[in-house]
Swiss-Prot record:
Family: Belongs to the bacterial ribosomal protein bS20 family.
UniProt organism field: Burkholderia cenocepacia (strain HI2424)
Pfam families: Ribosomal_S20p
Cellular component, GO annotation: cytosol; small ribosomal subunit
UniProt-recorded name of the protein: Small ribosomal subunit protein bS20
Region listing for Disordered, in residue ranges: 1-25
Molecular function terms from GO: small ribosomal subunit rRNA binding; structural constituent of ribosome
Length: 90
């Protein structure tokens, strides 16, 4: 248990940051899932639109160091390949 005022404050700050970071990580995963779902449905226009929005979200979260920049780049690359594959199949 945090006994000093400083320790109590750090515990409050950590809880607040954890809550905020969890929400951003959830947003990251949701953006990826929405693009994947559109690709699986075969909706080329929707997939491209969602991909553009997902890239913006992924970059923002990587800039804030919620996820590592390499993980963000890998995610964007895989989504781009999926969207491009959908266009090639059509």
């Amino acid at each position: 248990m945090a006994n000093s005022a400083q320790a109590r404050k750090r515990a409050r700050q950590a809880a607040k940051a954890n809550s905020h970071n969890s929400a951003l990580r959830s947003k990251f995963r949701t953006a990826i899932k929405s693009v994947r779902k559109a690709v699986e449905a075969g909706d080329q226009a929707k997939a491209a639109e969602l991909f553009k929005a997902a890239v913006k979200t992924i970059d923002t979260i990587a800039d804030k160091k919620i996820v590592h920049k390499n993980k963000a780049a890998r995610s964007k690359s895989r989504l781009a390949a999926a969207v491009k594959g959908l266009q090639a199949a059509a």
